[in-house]
Amino acid sequence: MRINPTTSGSEVSTVEKKNLGRIVKIIGPVLDVAFPPGKMPNIYNALVVQGRGNEQTNVTCEVQQLLGNNRVRAVAMSDTDGLMRGMEVIDTGAPISVPVGGSTLGRIFNVLGQPVDNLGPVDTNTTSPIHRSAPAFIQLDTKLSIFETGIKVVDLLAPYRRGGKIGLFGGAGVGKTVLIMELINNIAKAHGGVSVFGGVGERTREGNDLYLEMKESGVINEENIPESKVALVYGQMNEPPGARMRVGLTALTMAEYFRDVNEQDVLLFIDNIFRFVQAGSEVSALLGRMPSAVGYQPTLSTEMGYLQERITSTKEGSITSIQAVYVPADDLTDPAPATTFAHLDATTVLSRGLAAKGIYPAVDPLDSTSTMLQPRIVGEEHYETARGVKQTLQRYKELQDIIAILGLDELSEEDRLTVARARKIERFLSQPFFVAEVFTGSPGKYVGLAETIRGFQLILSGELDGLPEQAFYLVGNIDEATAKAMNLKT
């Protein structure tokens, strides 16, 4: 892995002033810069704009196009307010580089790898460029194993692959960010894993809430910051498209160091991968490229592949990536979510219908998929239980029109039994979360895979047909459901 001994590309003091250009044009966050003949910077090089005289205007840009006539077009990583034509621009001679390693844990960074949490500078001289090629095929690890999350609906019906890529699909307000926070919490506590969280183009308030939640739950250790389990990298909604487009790569670069150098298993969370595409679309238009379907950039598949192919498992360690995917207007055929689908090992689809019923997590058990749900990987018992649950829920879905028109009484005895079990299963798929204790009033539950399988087997077998369906709502394992049923009877 290529490591640069310098600090962030934005700090001018570390840059030799050997290649100077001047701004000739500014269009919002895009700058055209002229350089002397024969001194053109490479694509992806970081450029730093210097203020005139005593002005402190250190704006870092990234070269995106070579225009000819000794000019390049670059995209700014921060606001371009105050920039003027004629200002001096320094070519740093390398891509943006960010700090990596254990000292990044417990800290919040921006796209340039600068800490933004007011806790002082990062104690490391080890940095890494955000642009690098994906691992070679010969380095990849191809073993298949399940990554247990402690969330019943996920582990049973759409299990995650260790070192795989998982998509959380859903419209606005159905619980993607809460699910991501719960996964970070469970993974830190149950697996002791290191996580990197990339906040790409989401709300600043959510980033702040997540940080405070992590401090409360001990994922970030305030007393001893290096003992923390997560590094946070934020490029929020209010930032220019250049920052939102590159913040995912900054987070990935930090995760790659833990995988390749520290040889650890890492969790990379990206919230939200759609905003990465959206930022690319904005930049593409500013660079003058012709838009393709639905106004997206023509390079959509290439950009997505460039990011996703670096998220993989090698013989040294693994990166398991969980990516929230906002689905515009709940349309799964939109080019952004459709392009993301191609790279995923598992999909967790959140349903507005389930959220409306108050069933959280609102994971759709029929739409969510996983390449891991095969008998040779998960075992016959798990596979048959999951298949039985899906068949029961599918039959319930088919019967809903008849129930709506004619009522339950018109169904056959067998169908009435199927409906009763399906409603119990639907409620048992809900679960109280640690990070949502404030909303649910119930303490969070981590449910192991064996317990999950046992619970659903009991419902499918008919052993629990006599229990009321509300006993299965917002509980952990099946023993809690039977205890709750006893309380309801008294």
From Swiss-Prot:
Topological relation to the membrane, as annotated: Peripheral membrane protein
PROSITE patterns associated with the record: ATPASE_ALPHA_BETA (PS00152)
Annotated InterPro entries: AAA+_ATPase, ATP-synt_VA_C, ATP_synth_F1_bsu, ATPase_a/bsu_AS, ATPase_alpha/beta_chains, ATPase_F1/V1/A1_a/bsu_N, ATPase_F1/V1/A1_a/bsu_N_sf, ATPase_F1/V1/A1_a/bsu_nucl-bd
A GO biological process held by the record: proton motive force-driven mitochondrial ATP synthesis
Sorted UniProt keywords: ATP synthesis, ATP-binding, CF(1), Chloroplast, Hydrogen ion transport, Ion transport, Membrane, Nucleotide-binding, Plastid, Thylakoid, Translocase, Transport
Binding site for ATP: 170-177
Recorded catalytic activity of this chain's protein: ATP + H2O + 4 H(+)(in) = ADP + phosphate + 5 H(+)(out)
Keyword ATP-binding on entry: yes
Enzyme class: translocase
Chief localisation class: plastid
Localisation per UniProt entry: Plastid, Chloroplast thylakoid membrane
Domain of life from the UniProt record: Eukaryota
SUPFAM superfamilies associated with the record: C-terminal domain of alpha and beta subunits of F1 ATP synthase, N-terminal domain of alpha and beta subunits of F1 ATP synthase, P-loop containing nucleoside triphosphate hydrolases
Record's GO cellular component terms: chloroplast thylakoid membrane; mitochondrion; proton-transporting ATP synthase complex
Role according to the record: Produces ATP from ADP in the presence of a proton gradient across the membrane. The catalytic sites are hosted primarily by the beta subunits.
PANTHER family (alphabetical): ATP SYNTHASE (PTHR15184), ATP SYNTHASE SUBUNIT BETA, MITOCHONDRIAL (PTHR15184:SF71)
Protein name in the entry: ATP synthase subunit beta, chloroplastic
Organism name: Ipomoea batatas (Sweet potato)
Upper classification of the organism: Eukaryota, Viridiplantae, Streptophyta, Embryophyta, Tracheophyta
